[in-house]
Amino acid sequence: MKRLGSTFAIVAVFFGSSIAYSADAPIGKWQTVDDKSGKVESEVEVYQEGGKLFGKIVSLAEPTDANGQPKRCTKCTGADKDKPIVGLVIIKGLSASGDRYKDGTITDPADGKVYKAEVWTEDGKLKVRGYLGMFYKTQTWVKAN
């Protein structure tokens, strides 16, 4: 019985350490930063639902258009067409895979395009990569206060 208990302890330590190396869910609010100006453009709340990762825009630096109306995703297609950008779910259905989340999509509300997506944390920041075929672009988001 003593041997069974120590075997269980070894197995528990092994599995516990393998879980520690799985993707850390970057739950919380993140600021998107313009690559050229370095200014904060929006704040995205990343959350889990049904074991998958999602992210919705919760604020914009400039939330209204020239007419004072809330900005809308006019170039989006499908169910997101003409939805207000604040509240728009832009990261959809990412699954944990090793130290990253992938196999989902990200929408760029500026052009309405949907890209395959992958995210991971690095040095306390969130790396967000969108793929179009073999080409990709990676943005760095910073944790919001």
Which sequence ranges carry the predicted segments?
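Bacterial N-terminal signal peptides that target proteins for export
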Residues: 1-8
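Sec/Tat signal peptide C-region and signal peptidase I cleavage site
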Residues: 18-23
